Design a protein with these regions (language model features):
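Acidic, His/Gly-enriched loop-helix segments that form or flank divalent-metal centers
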Residues: 1-99
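Short, charged, surface-exposed secondary-structure boundary motifs
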Residues: 98-107
Length: 108
């Protein structure tokens, strides 16, 4: 499937997607696709740590050691409703299965 996707996706689109950051720090929030690897400093997280693993499905993980009170906001592991668990918030509520999309605005 991945190979077929690369065949049909125009090269400029693929280049754009590959050029995007895998982690964004925005104030007290850290935004990633799949969370962050527990007990690994943010500065040492790999691309794979941030976009592929299912560690976000495991509750009570120890946060990255240099999180400094920030909150990791991620998806990748479908949940029925957004779930806040200590140092992380999972906002993947299966938007690809026509239900609803979680949207967060700036803090008031």
């Amino acid at each position: 499937l991945a190979e077929r996707f690369r065949e049909v996706l125009p090269a400029p689109h693929l280049a754009f997607l590959r050029s995007r950051p895998v982690m964004i720090r925005a104030g007290r929030h850290v935004l990633t696709h799949a969370g962050a690897a527990a007990e690994t400093p943010l500065v040492r997280q790999t691309r794979a740590d941030l976009i592929w693993p299912r560690h976000a499905a495991i509750p009570d993980l120890v946060p990255p050691v240099d999180l400094g009170g920030r909150i990791v906001v991620h998806g990748h592991v479908p949940v029925a409703i957004p779930r806040a668990e200590g140092w992380r918030i999972n906002v993947d509520n299966e938007a690809e299965a026509p239900r609803f999309l979680t949207v967060e605005g700036p803090p008031a």
